[in-house]
Amino acid sequence: MFQVTFSDVAIDFSHEEWRWLNSTQRNLYKDVMVQNYENLVSLGLSIPKPYVIALLEDGKEPCMVEEKLSKDTFPDCKTRWENKELSMKEDIYDEDLPQMVLKEKTIQQNHEFSNFNKDLYYIKKFKGKYENQVEHFRPVTLTFRESPIGESVYKCNAFKSIFHLKSVFSEPQRISAEGKSHKCDILKKSLPTNSVIKNENINDGKKLLNSNESVAAFSQSKSLTLHQTLNKEKIYTCNECGKAFGKQSILNRHWRIHTGEKPYECHECGKTFSHGSSLTRHQISHSGEKPYKCIECGKAFSHVSSLTNHQSTHTGEKPYECMNCGKAFSRVSHLIEHLRIHTQEKLYECRICGKAFIHRSSLIHHQKIHTGEKPYECRECGKAFCCSSHLTRHQRIHAIEKQFECNKCLKVFSSLSFLIQHQSIHTEEKPFECQKCGKSFNQPESLNMHLRNHTRLKPYECSICGKAFSHRSSLFQHHRIHTGEKPYECIKCGKTFSCSSNLTVHQRIHTGEKPYKCNECGKAFSKGSNLTAHQRVHNGEKPSSTISVEKSLGHMSHCVYERSHNRETA
């Protein structure tokens, strides 16, 4: 298993190549590069920010800047670069230290190597006043067709690389079979020394340092030192999740996952982001530009990654499968997020109450409980919500078109479940019966609420007067007695009510609606309780005067109680 680097998925363009790309192709390239980088970072890979990404974040063109490199560019290396034409290209920049890539396309050497072509990539690091001097080179990725006579080939199987260092660092040298070895403490390998190889003639064509599966071999001790530096251990560890990184800057960027820090703010809408590249991608949404169009349905997107994700809905392809439960996903990020369910890994912890969550979105949603933030506001009534899903559910109330209409009373509802629940009023079907008193209900929820009257379980207590209730809704309704709140207003006469049901009954005075009809005589009533009392006449029952008096007294006492509280709170 080898580690994927950004260079494995990156594409470089010269100025000449970049000129031939149109705007759509350039936008496609930019989105792909940013998406590839974000995918690598999300997998926890400790990679420096590529220079091409830094250019994209600054809104600059990502094509390579080419310069001709002559033998006078670096005086210290004049003799080593004779008879060569090298081109220098700026490439990836480390966050802590700038880097350059020297890409040698064609080497024009003496007649012995005139037909030898290969690609060499070296990275030169420099600082401050040493900017114009060669400090050291790092072999990155090297390919060749054939090795000329006298060239030493250096192989590191652990990192899947072949190192060609001939005539760039030193004259041709020969490694003694009896030489001492340099040992790499990182890879725990023995490496041949260069103490006895200077100024020796080459007599066997080329030297290939053969190695076993994990050997890293070098002909010079300074090459070993460089190798160890470039492949040092990851010493920066996250205290929250234990993930390790090779650089402090990468750890700092990773830390934002736990802290929720988002230092990059959009000046258009105020939305914040944890990475500059995410802000750049977001700002495209304000321009309204959507150059990426789905050929199946015609839907357009501002980012190529969004188009790619959308296209999976047409194909139904889900190549990423969970090995634990077999569930498949169309995106690898969804699979990674899903795997936390099996591991019960909760990386995101609330710093206020200590509650932990599997998903970062769940933590953000939870934190709004502490802050009281309600950013989603209904344009119809101004009511605010902490979640967009809550706002969507609320907006159904204001929907002009309501799909579900009762064929009995023509009342409309926003969902089928509400319509079915309402229709039980007209059918008077009450299949749910209380085993204690025999009372029947048309909904199981109503029966469950009724059963609390028998058990006398009242878990909801008023914090002001101490009165307890069996239902949470009853507590909310009672609490309005203390606050005097009457949010439900009749649009006909302006009268206000503390309960929506009271407003509904009141509005029937204006509309003349009487939905409760007696099956015996056809008489209709505006209240269900009036119909129940009327039906006793047909059954030969005579309502007890005691019960009527108790009901009247109870209603009166409730009104007196409400008025007394209103005076206390006034």
UniProtKB/Swiss-Prot annotation:
GO CC annotations on file: nucleus
GO terms, molecular function: DNA-binding transcription factor activity, RNA polymerase II-specific; RNA polymerase II cis-regulatory region sequence-specific DNA binding; zinc ion binding
GO biological process: regulation of transcription by RNA polymerase II
Coiled coil regions, renumbered to chain: none
CDD domains associated with the record: KRAB_A-box (cd07765)
Keyword tags: DNA-binding, Isopeptide bond, Metal-binding, Nucleus, Repeat, Transcription, Transcription regulation, Ubl conjugation, Zinc, Zinc-finger
ZnF C2H2-type span: 236-258, 264-286, 292-314, 320-342, 348-370, 376-398, 404-426, 432-454, 460-482, 488-510, 516-538
Reported function: May be involved in transcriptional regulation.
Protein name per UniProt: Zinc finger protein 181
Source species: Bos taurus
